[in-house]
Structures are given as structure tokens and as C-alpha cells.
């Protein structure tokens, strides 16, 4: 008799995705981040669900409901901080996952890659709306500043912003709809993640060499299930260390006073995981130009397959490209630092140089390096 996991309509899908899936024998720990992102998403949905049970999406009570969760609800404080810091872990895993894709040329799986970019946008939108919900000072002003960027769109801009706000400023209507969207989006992300996996399983995983691994496959279970469990344990360890020892480390103290439309915080800035994009936005003096640069800083990922000029897929055997890749990482860290600094000398010029460097590396220098490496192969 055939095993039930191979015949049952539902179990068959699980089996083909997580048990009998043929996987490359040499994928490194950089391939763990996909499963870690899945765990982050499940964790965020669960903690978010329990927070939503006690949260009220109303301007007068939102802030106090979050305070109530932290003070009066059983283990409310740990649920709240797991949710807030879980978002940080989510983005750390996302950046690692995307970086892995760039380094090892995984973007040549076009469908998987493009769904991944959509997932990145969806996650960023969700995190932004979630940051507005506690209705602290930075929540309110962050929402005001970022939504206001849409007014840079010619002709329809102002109407669009007021439509999103549900009024003439960020108010009750805005908070309520942000809560509604923040609740539904993770489920859309989960659905997209399944499509992401569906496309990935059409081709199979890439591996560090970038060479086809069809000749040397091993079953996903037990090899990669146990490896994923180890990754998950390390993720939970890191998250709980953050939550239990320094839960406010990555937060902004400016979000502790309740929202006050009459008082602007000295430095409006988003959570740390948006700072690199925020720095690119601020480095262009023109409003529309800044917004375009902001969107393009992420959307540029879609161009990666077309900018790939190398004869090799992975960067494993391409030292010049490796150097440029790590310069890009350093550049992104510089942008993240600049995004959190006030708009004054020397930060302005550093931010502008780092922004130029970012686009220059991706659009010009890396494709050039690949071409040079192709020619070096002939020697």
C-alpha cells in the first residue's frame, strides 16, 4: 500500500513541498532565510491576532489601549514586544534573503524573483501601517509625512492623499483603515508566499555555485528540515533576547508621547528598516524626484535579471563582483545611518553621495565588472 502522504490530496502537496522535495546537496545557511521568513510571518500573525483582541482603532483610545495591553493584559507586554521586535527580525531576514538572491544570482528565476519583490513591497506597506497604530507622536507624524509624499504625483496627487486619509488630515478615518489593512495584509503576504514557493518548486533551488544541481539531489526531509529547525531556534533565541533584555532598543523614544497634531517632533524618521530608503528620499531636493528615487530604490530589484551580464550565475567565482557587492552592502549601511541623522552638514552630502553610489553600483559598476570578468575568462 502506498504511503498516505503520497496519496492524500492535501498531504501530497505538503509532501512534495517539504518532505520528498529533491534539494541541492550543497545549499548553505544563506538558504535558511526563506523558512525563517515563514516562521516570522506566522509569529507576527499570531501575536498580532492577540494584540487585535485588546486594541481599539480610535484616535482617542488607541494609545491607551496599547498601554492597557502592556500593563493589564496577561503577558500583554511580551506579546506586544514580540510583535514589534518580530517586525525587526522579519526585515533582517528579508534583507539577508534578498542579499543572498543578489549574490548567488537567484534572480534568474524571474517569476520567483518578481513575486519576491512584490512580497517585499507588501511587507514594507504592512510594517508602515502597523507603526501608525499605537498612535504615538512618531506614528502620527510618520503617517502624515509618508502619505503626503503621494501629493507629489502630478494632477491627482492632492486628491489621492485626501482619499487615503479619508479627510483633510491624518485622523480617525486614517487610523481605522490602516488597522483594517494592517490586519488583512499578512494574509495576502501568506498567499503570495505560497505562489513564491510554487514558482520556486517549478525550477528547484539555486545553490552557491550557480551550477545546475540536478545530478546531485538529496531529500528535503530529514536533511533540510533539521537544518531549518536549527535556524528557527537561533531566530527565536535572537528575538527573545531582544524582547526580554532590550525591547525598546530598536524603537524610537519619540513614539512614547501620545500623538499631538499641534507639536512636530524635532526629527521625523521611520523605523530602522526603512532608513536606507528614507535617506535616498531626503537626498534629492525635489519632492517628486525624491519620491521616484524612493520607489526606484526597491523597484530596481526587478531589473536585476536584465542587468546580469556575467557568463556565470553566482558570484562565488567572481572576485570583482564580490568586492562591489560588499561595497553595496556597506553603502546600504551608510544610508541606514544617514537616514537616522538630522538634515544638516555633513550628513546631507554623505547621504547624496551614498545615494548616487547605490544606483551607480547596481546600474553601471556591477554589470561592467561582470563584463570584465567574462573577458578575463578568455585569458
From Swiss-Prot:
One of its GO terms (molecular function) is metal ion binding. It comes from the Eukaryota. It is found in: Mitochondrion inner membrane. Binds 2 heme b groups non-covalently. Heme b b566 binds at residues 97, 196. Gene3D superfamilies: Cytochrome Bc1 Complex, Chain C (1.20.810.10). It is a multi-pass membrane protein. PROSITE patterns: CYTB_CTER (PS51003), CYTB_NTER (PS51002). Heme b b562 binds at residues 83, 182. The chain crosses the membrane at residues 33-53, 77-98, 113-133, 178-198, 226-246, 288-308, 320-340, 347-367. A ubiquinone binds at residue 201. GO terms for biological process: mitochondrial electron transport, ubiquinol to cytochrome c. InterPro entries: Cyt_b/b6_C, Cyt_b/b6_C_sf, Cyt_b/b6_N, Cytb/b6-like_sf, Cytochrome_b, Cytochrome_b_C_euk/bac, Cytochrome_b_N_euk/bac, Di-haem_cyt_TM. Its cofactor is heme b. GO terms for cellular component: mitochondrial inner membrane; respiratory chain complex III. SUPFAM superfamilies: a domain/subunit of cytochrome bc1 complex (Ubiquinol-cytochrome c reductase), Transmembrane di-heme cytochromes. Keywords: Electron transport, Heme, Iron, Membrane, Metal-binding, Mitochondrion, Mitochondrion inner membrane, Respiratory chain, Transmembrane, Transmembrane helix, Transport, Ubiquinone. Component of the ubiquinol-cytochrome c reductase complex (complex III or cytochrome b-c1 complex) that is part of the mitochondrial respiratory chain. The b-c1 complex mediates electron transfer from ubiquinol to cytochrome c. Contributes to the generation of a proton gradient across the mitochondrial membrane that is then used for ATP synthesis. The cytochrome bc1 complex contains 11 subunits: 3 respiratory subunits (MT-CYB, CYC1 and UQCRFS1), 2 core proteins (UQCRC1 and UQCRC2) and 6 low-molecular weight proteins (UQCRH/QCR6, UQCRB/QCR7, UQCRQ/QCR8, UQCR10/QCR9, UQCR11/QCR10 and a cleavage product of UQCRFS1). This cytochrome bc1 complex then forms a dimer. Heme 1 (or BL or b562) is low-potential and absorbs at about 562 nm, and heme 2 (or BH or b566) is high-potential and absorbs at about 566 nm. Belongs to the cytochrome b family. This is Cytochrome b. It comes from Cephalophorus rufilatus (Red-flanked duiker). The lineage of its organism: Eukaryota, Metazoa, Chordata, Craniata, Vertebrata. The gene is MT-CYB.
Amino acid at each position: 500500500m502506498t504511503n498516505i502522504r503520497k496519496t492524500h490530496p492535501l498531504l501530497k502537496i505538503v509532501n512534495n513541498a517539504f518532505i520528498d522535495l529533491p534539494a541541492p546537496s550543497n545549499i548553505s545557511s544563506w538558504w535558511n532565510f526563506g523558512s525563517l521568513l515563514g516562521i516570522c510571518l506566522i509569529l507576527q500573525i499570531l501575536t498580532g491576532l492577540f494584540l487585535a483582541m485588546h486594541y481599539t482603532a480610535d484616535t482617542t483610545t488607541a494609545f491607551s489601549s496599547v498601554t492597557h495591553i502592556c500593563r493589564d493584559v496577561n503577558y500583554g507586554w511580551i506579546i506586544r514586544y514580540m510583535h514589534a521586535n518580530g517586525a525587526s527580525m522579519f526585515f533582517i531576514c528579508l534583507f539577508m534573503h534578498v542579499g543572498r538572491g543578489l549574490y548567488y544570482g537567484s534572480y534568474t528565476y524571474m517569476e520567483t524573483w518578481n513575486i519576491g519583490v512584490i512580497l517585499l513591497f507588501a511587507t514594507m506597506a504592512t510594517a508602515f501601517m502597523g507603526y501608525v497604530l499605537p498612535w504615538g507622536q512618531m506614528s502620527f507624524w510618520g503617517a502624515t509625512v509618508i502619505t503626503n509624499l503621494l501629493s507629489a504625483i502630478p494632477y491627482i496627487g492632492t486628491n489621492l492623499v485626501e482619499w487615503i486619509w479619508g479627510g483633510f488630515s491624518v485622523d480617525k478615518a486614517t487610523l481605522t483603515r490602516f488597522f483594517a489593512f494592517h490586519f488583512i495584509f499578512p494574509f495576502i503576504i501568506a498567499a503570495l508566499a505560497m505562489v513564491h514557493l510554487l514558482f520556486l518548486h517549478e525550477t528547484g533551488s539555486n545553490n552557491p555555485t550557480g551550477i545546475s544541481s540536478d545530478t546531485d539531489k538529496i531529500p528535503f526531509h530529514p536533511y533540510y528540515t533539521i537544518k531549518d529547525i536549527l535556524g528557527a531556534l537561533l531566530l527565536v533565541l535572537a528575538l527573545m533576547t531582544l524582547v526580554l533584555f532590550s525591547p525598546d532598543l530598536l524603537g524610537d523614544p519619540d513614539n512614547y508621547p501620545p500623538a499631538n497634531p499641534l507639536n512636530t517632533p524635532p526629527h521625523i524618521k521611520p523605523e530602522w528598516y526603512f532608513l536606507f530608503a528614507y535617506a535616498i528620499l531626503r537626498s534629492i531636493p525635489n519632492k517628486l524626484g525624491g519620491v521616484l528615487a524612493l520607489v526606484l530604490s526597491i523597484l530596481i530589484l526587478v531589473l536585476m535579471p536584465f542587468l546580469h551580464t556575467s557568463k556565470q550565475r553566482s558570484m562565488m567565482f567572481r572576485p570583482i563582483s564580490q568586492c562591489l557587492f560588499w561595497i553595496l552592502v556597506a553603502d546600504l549601511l551608510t544610508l541606514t545611518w544617514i537616514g537616522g541623522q538630522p538634515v544638516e552638514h555633513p550628513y546631507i552630502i554623505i547621504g547624496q553621495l551614498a545615494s548616487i553610489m547605490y544606483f551607480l553600483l547596481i546600474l553601471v559598476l556591477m554589470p561592467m565588472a561582470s563584463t570584465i570578468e567574462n573577458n578575463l575568462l578568455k585569458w
